[in-house]
Amino acid sequence: MELIYPRVLDGQFLIGDALAEIQARLLEQGAKSKCVGDLPFLTFDPMQLVVVKDSSNTVIGALLGTPVDSETGVVSGEYRLSVPLNDDIDEFVEKQIYSLSGSFVFVLLADQARRIYLDACGSLSLVYDPERRTVASTSSLLLKGNELSDRFDRELYDFLRVERDGWFPGGLTGHIGIKRLMPNFYLDLEDFSTHRHWPIEPVGETSDPSDTCQTLLNEIGNTVRHLTEHGTVSVALTAGNETRMILAASKDFANKLNFVTVNADTHAASIDVIHASDIAKRFGLKHELIPLVKADNAAADEWRSRNGYCFGGPHIYNHPTIAALKARDYFVGGLGGEIGRAFFWRPDDTRETKLDAGTITARLGMPISKAVTEAVSIWLDQTQGFDSLTTLDLAYLELRMGCWGFAVSYGDYTPIDIHPLISRRSFVAMLSMPPEWRVMKNLTNPMILETVRLGWPELLETPLNKFGDHRDRFSRVRRAIKQPHLVLKRLRKRFG
């Protein structure tokens, strides 16, 4: 595989004093230059840069991306907070910034601290070079000349099978010396160290799971509704759990949404097409089936490059499919809902299950590598004071979602992706559920079922993630025959 610098950098950014050679290249490719305080930013449309001020009209930082305020909607231009910045930075950021949903990066520029924070799931991923003290959306913006190839860790890339379906966990990237910031950690711009800022104490278990499901439903619906007030919105509709929750939360304004389903020649896609079409017809939803479009090799090479050579799998060649929606402003998906599905738990796990770097790496389902084990060990040292079930949830959120799910944030730049299950309020709601509400059984769980029931109970009359008849008996066998490596990965997760 020959590495190339991306031709198109739409939706990307760089923060800090870039080397002159890098800055000149990015400006030539269309970057916009702006300083907030004394910190330089380079951004490529449609990436939005919003100046943040406190109640005293003092500039305290900037937001990148598409943040959504629960009261005023999509944030643009300038964001004015209703309180002054105080000395308790951690509490201030948690209350004022993590009240936002949407997809964003927050750069704090205060006298007492200069830091970078991701949103609750790191849906706008970023990487950084501690030596050059620069931060960017992907690695290529931090490199010059032959460094793209010379600093590429090809051995680790191949060992982790990134091209097929692997990824770099624990803050690793495909390039030596460049690290990825994980969700729930901030980057200190003074010394380029990272520190956990959430959670700082265990999330308490809710005494009323149904009421907490209502909170989750409201949070999802509020975010989607605000998007409809700001632009045109396409929403994924599948046979899955998360898109059903999004639809249930959007019942009152579903007529303002355009629902889409990918019509691909796969077993999972056939379930999606059948159930999505039935739901749309029954409830009068605007719905379209979009064809699976394959990239040629040149487009696949460009896509790998735009993502910093940190992501692989079928999407390398399937990514042009989303181009069917480029006339829309936003695409709403269901990523983040897995946090409420006990994804890394095993049936015999308890809050006291012994965990170490080796067992966490096995849960990730990837080959055992010294680099990965060391990275996970460092992460585990920063994740003390939580029971084992919470630690496994944080591993999924931080090591997988932040390093895999959103390492691909910049491959497709129109429309803007927003995942309304991602917010601090939503994640607190999910993590506060009793274990029995989160464990999956028959491809769903009580939290999902109750959330859908509260919003639109008739949607539960259509099966979740299955046909609901004899065809389900053969689905796993068919998948195992077509993709045997997935069986091995599942075994590593279960018994590794």
Q: Residue spans of the language-model regions?
A:
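Core structural elements
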Residues: 186, 395-406
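Acidic, carboxylate-rich catalytic segments that either coordinate divalent cations
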Residues: 487-496
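Cysteine-centered catalytic environments shared across enzyme families
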Residues: 1-235, 241, 245-291
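Short alpha-helical scaffolding segments that buttress acidic/His motifs in well-ordered protein cores
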Residues: 159-163, 393-400, 430
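ATP-dependent adenylate-handling active sites, centered on carboxylate activation for C-N bond formation
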Residues: 113, 191, 202-389, 404-461, ...
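Charge-dense polyanion-binding interfaces
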Residues: 144, 149-152, 161-163, 441-469
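Active-site/acyl-donor-binding loops of N-acyltransferases
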Residues: 186, 472-473
